[in-house]
Amino acid sequence: LKAEHLIRTHYRDALRGYRLTKAAKEMLLSVSPLRFQCYLTGNTETNLIRSEVSRRIRLHQKAETYLTLLHAGIPFYPDVKPDIFCNHREAGSIGMRSLPLFYASREIKELGPETTKIRNSRSMGILMAPQCVYVLYNTGNGVLKWEYRTEVRLNAFLQHYLQGYPYNGHPQIRAIMTGTDMEMAFRLFTSTGGYKKSLFMLDTSFEHFHYLPNTPEGEVLLKLLVHPEIMEKLDNLLLSDLGCRSDSIPLEHDATDASGNPILLAYDFDMQRINRFNTGLNVYGRSGNLICFDFQIPVLKKYLTATIHFSSIDLCKFKRGFLHEP
């Protein structure tokens, strides 16, 4: 692309990046104007030269998020989905069969004054799946800035705005945090918000908060999170030879083993559930079992403090058996 003069290197403040040339923008706009005009025309953020490090990093994280969505087969371009964040949206213009779909934060904020109170949200956008709505964040290789009240307002706004459209009643709102690698999950688990409490920490803004890396492993997990029928199939397989949940065990769990110990399905890497499971085991002095993907085990062993036995799901076998990928 550099040899064809479609991109050029931009190096400033010890940060290297790439920018589209004028020829590249013109080519994209001529090939698919409906797809790219919102990114490459006017005063949109992606069409202006940004020199501030924070803005350049934010744009890089957006691109990283789009690449993860692309590899997971999730539509995000404006020309392949209905415009639902507008004042003239039509009921029935989006159906459950068309999900999953991703809407960027900028698309949501086009509603205008209705979104004033969520303009400072750190989200990249929302991922509408058949069973719930995920608010997507990208922490990159550092702990994300966080404003609890803003994210709570975003949660409430989405429940209200998407009620009955296309979900029955208020949709369940969950969150997904992406990051450079699995090691970032440990930093998020252990974050206390920093000196001024302005950084991310696990709080009550979302009852369920998943983590996945911006890697091929994370892309597989993302595919799983937006296909509840595959998750149900995997759950049934994992629980088939285990005991049922026990009301006598006063902590979060999905099943029990032959000795009556609680078992948690943690392959979806819900940081909130994992944290509650670990805390419960410590409080009640119990041991437990945790089932997750093989690539998730090292960071969990590093973080968890309770007596826990790990059972791993082979990611390669899962891809072949459930996603029919090599």
Feature locations, PLM:
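C-terminal regulatory/effector modules of DNA-binding transcriptional regulators
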Residues: Y137-P326
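Mid-protein regulatory/catalytic core that forms ligand/cofactor-binding pockets
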Residues: R56-S198
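Short secondary-structure junctions
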Residues: R8-T9, I74-V80, K233-G243
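Conserved aromatic-histidine-acidic binding/catalytic patches
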Residues: R12, R50-I57
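Accessory beta->alpha helical hairpin/"wing" motif in late/C-terminal subdomains of nucleic-acid enzymes
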Residues: E4-G42
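A short, surface-exposed helix-loop junction/capping segment
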Residues: C38-E52
